[in-house]
Amino acid sequence: MLTHYDEAVFGKILWQAARSKWWIVPTSLLYALLSAVLILYAMAQAWWFYIPVAIAVSFFLWRIYEVHQSVVLVTEKMLLVTNGYTWEKGAGYFPKREYLAVSYKEIVGFSHRFTEMTVGEPTYGGLAQISVPFAFLSPSDKQKLVSYIEEKQGNAS
């Protein structure tokens, strides 16, 4: 189910996992370099060229911000996987982050590259694979996530 984080429903956030620094730093530097090159190029162009450059630089800055955000929230009751943004009525002009909520007892496993999560009941037609952005988590965060899920599943039994 896609939802927004609500402490009353999901409990407190115990920890968050973001992308690995080995992914964040080069990606951020690439976007910063592209922004700098565009700005320098625009300085030698006509004034009207500043508008598309400003849009492109704004996009690059937003991507730098996004690459630093958490991709998974581990809460007391469920695992929340980052999905994107929605425009909610009453939220003004600011989008609200949306999460895929998955119960710990429904998680069966992950693909070997952590690009997919298998959920459901291990019966015929009872499993589903969901694409998840866990490929760029650090190895320690991946292990911590798997250990916590196994711990929660052990307590639920």
What are these model-predicted stretches?
Residues V25-P26, I39-I55:
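Hydrophobic alpha-helical transmembrane segments
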Residues A36-A44, R63-E66:
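Short hydrophobic alpha-helical membrane-anchoring segments
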Residues M1-I13, V81-K89, Y93-F94, R113, ...:
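A composition-biased, non-transmembrane "mature-region" signal
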Residues W87-L127:
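Acidic, Ser/Thr-rich low-complexity segments on the non-lumenal side of membrane proteins
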Residues F60-A101:
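Conserved beta-hairpin
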Residues Y31-L34, F49-I64:
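Canonical hydrophobic alpha-helical transmembrane segment
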